[in-house]
């Protein structure tokens, strides 16, 4: 596969090398360029778990970050000249990749989120395949690869992130064979039979094989990738079982050996634990309970508004528990914080309408004037407010139909130094493999979800403390630093540069 529109990439001259020994390449920068009412611009922290996970790693290594600055650039706004070169923002070196409205529509909203996202999440929604989307995906990936090439010093380590940039490793290797390249996928990698639906399946696998190390959350994803690389590209692959942070698989392609491994991502659990102990956070948590009418129990959901997250499942389960009298309407409330997401994609617009209809129905059926049983907020919550909600709630509901990891579950656990609360967790999250002392449920089994919620609501204090203590032991020991270090250690031990 040619890296972009059939054109061969050119290896950069040494004069074009950057000065960063460590480069993160992701769809978004850790900050967005935002236009103010007076027409001026400012930088604002980007939403999303990827930024939360990677920013501390980048700061410690004094590296550079390549990504989209969050503003569409159609060439008509002269004041966007700030994006012309590297930027130092909050002590981070940023290399913006400028994307037009058409780029966003076809590369991001189209191929990334209407093709890859549903395919990789077990086809909960039917993937759409359009050649013009694919062509734009190739073109934008080439631009990211070129930006990374310009940012990286000779012999640097480049860490490419997630499904939007799966072609970048091969493209970057063609540009800069001196680099050590890692790739990590933050969403599930699908079973072989689903991935084979993809018209451009071989090109995707070839793109990933440009890396020295390809990482997934779980061993199953790594095994799927090895099978596909053998079947589609003809690599000689290892046949043993891939372990967690150990027992790496291998795919041999020509003179190169690509490591394949499982590295479950986590959160900055120490920082969350510290923040949740803060006096102001504790006071805000008490205020939240008061504002909700001092219910006996608070159920909490925190999600992007996405069809994979199972928000409708927990609402349906809560509604039926109320109808059956297993949950009392006068002493239990459900708070759902739903962060807006991909609002221009039709399936997401439909989902929002459906969720808001469900909320209205439940409140109409079981709420009272001034006392709804479901409190629904369709907006992002500031970090401290979110932590206060974690501390205030009695049961955390994490019920995705499919999720690569789900960091919200780990964030909740990290915030419960009081050993209070309970976690109801979908079996179809990556987190379920580690958080075995949660109340694990199958989101496709509504009765099972209802039973899990009821059990969590009615657990004894002793049983709850025992479960939370075990969950916290796991989350505090395996934080985001350990995730990053385990990946980067494995990358450093992968076959070295120059295998291009």
From Swiss-Prot:
Keywords: Glycosyltransferase, Transferase. GO terms for cellular component: cytosol. The gene is otsA. It holds the Pfam family Glyco_transf_20. InterPro entries: Glyco_trans_20 (IPR001830). The record marks 117, 187 as: Involved in alpha anomer selectivity. D-glucose 6-phosphate binds at residues 28, 108, 162, 342. Transmembrane segments: none annotated. Pathway: Glycan biosynthesis; trehalose biosynthesis. GO terms for biological process: trehalose biosynthetic process. It comes from the Bacteria. Belongs to the glycosyltransferase 20 family. UDP-alpha-D-glucose binds at residues 48-49, 304, 309, 407-411. It catalyses: ADP-alpha-D-glucose + D-glucose 6-phosphate = alpha,alpha-trehalose 6-phosphate + ADP + H(+); CDP-alpha-D-glucose + D-glucose 6-phosphate = alpha,alpha-trehalose 6-phosphate + CDP + H(+); GDP-alpha-D-glucose + D-glucose 6-phosphate = alpha,alpha-trehalose 6-phosphate + GDP + H(+); TDP-alpha-D-glucose + D-glucose 6-phosphate = 5-methyl-UDP + alpha,alpha-trehalose 6-phosphate + H(+). The keyword Glycosyltransferase applies. It comes from Mycobacterium bovis (strain BCG / Pasteur 1173P2). This is Trehalose-6-phosphate synthase. Homotetramer. Its EC number is 2.4.1.15, 2.4.1.347. Probably involved in the osmoprotection via the biosynthesis of trehalose and in the production of glycogen and alpha-glucan via the TreS-Pep2 branch involved in the biosynthesis of maltose-1-phosphate (M1P). Catalyzes the transfer of glucose from UDP-glucose (UDP-Glc) to D-glucose 6-phosphate (Glc-6-P) to form trehalose-6-phosphate. Probably also able to use ADP-Glc, CDP-Glc, GDP-Glc and TDP-Glc as glucosyl donors. GO terms for molecular function: alpha,alpha-trehalose-phosphate synthase (GDP-forming) activity; alpha,alpha-trehalose-phosphate synthase (UDP-forming) activity; trehalose-phosphatase activity.
């Amino acid at each position: 596969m040619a890296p972009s529109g059939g054109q061969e990439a050119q290896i950069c001259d040494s004069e074009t090398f950057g000065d960063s020994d460590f480069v993160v390449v992701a769809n978004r920068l850790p900050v967005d360029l935002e236009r103010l009412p007076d027409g001026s611009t400012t930088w604002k922290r980007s939403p999303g778990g990827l930024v939360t996970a990677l920013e501390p790693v980048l700061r410690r290594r004094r590296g550079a970050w390549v990504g989209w600055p969050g503003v569409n650039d159609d060439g008509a706004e002269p004041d966007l000249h700030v994006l012309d070169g590297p930027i130092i923002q909050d002590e981070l070196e940023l290399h913006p990749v400028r994307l037009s409205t058409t780029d966003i529509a076809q590369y991001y909203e189209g191929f990334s989120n209407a093709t890859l996202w549903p395919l990789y999440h077990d086809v909960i929604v039917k993937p759409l395949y359009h050649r013009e989307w694919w062509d734009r995906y190739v073109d934008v990936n080439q631009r990211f690869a070129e930006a990374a090439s310009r940012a990286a010093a000779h012999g640097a380590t480049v860490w490419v992130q997630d499904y939007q940039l799966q072609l970048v490793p091969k493209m970057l290797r063609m540009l800069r064979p001196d680099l050590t390249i890692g790739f990590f996928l933050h969403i599930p990698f699908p079973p072989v039979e689903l991935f084979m639906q993809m018209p451009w399946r071989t090109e995707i696998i070839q793109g990933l094989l440009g890396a020295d190390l390809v990482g997934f959350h779980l061993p199953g994803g790594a095994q799927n990738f090895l099978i596909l690389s053998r079947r589609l590209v003809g690599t000689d692959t290892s046949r043993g079982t891939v372990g967690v942070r150990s027992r790496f698989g291998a795919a041999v392609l020509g003179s190169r050996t690509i490591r394949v491994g499982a590295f479950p991502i986590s959160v900055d659990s120490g920082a969350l634990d510290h923040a949740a102990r803060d006096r102001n956070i504790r006071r805000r948590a008490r205020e939240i309970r008061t504002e909700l009418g001092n219910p006996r129990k608070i159920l909490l959901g925190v999600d992007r508004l996405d069809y994979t997250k199972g928000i409708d499942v927990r609402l349906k389960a809560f509604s039926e528990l109320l109808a059956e009298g297993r949950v009392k309407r006068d002493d239990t409330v459900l708070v759902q914080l739903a962060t807006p997401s991909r609002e221009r994609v039709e399936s997401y617009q439909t989902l929002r309408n459906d969720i808001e209809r469900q909320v209205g129905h439940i409140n109409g059926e079981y709420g009272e004037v001034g006392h709804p049983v479901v409190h629904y907020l369709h907006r992002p919550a500031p970090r401290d407010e979110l932590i206060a909600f974690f501390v205030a709630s009695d049961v955390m509901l994490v019920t995705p139909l499919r999720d690569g990891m789900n960091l919200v579950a780990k964030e909740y656990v990290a915030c419960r130094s009081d050993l209070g609360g309970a976690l109801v967790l979908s079996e179809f999250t990556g987190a379920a493999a580690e958080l075995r002392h949660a109340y694990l449920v199958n989101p496709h089994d509504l009765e099972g979800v209802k039973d899990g919620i009821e059990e969590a609501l009615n657990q004894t204090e002793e049983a709850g403390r025992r479960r939370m203590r075990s969950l916290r032991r796991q989350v505090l020991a395996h934080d985001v630093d350990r995730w990053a270090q385990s990946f980067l250690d494995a990358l450093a031990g992968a076959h070295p540069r120059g295998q291009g």
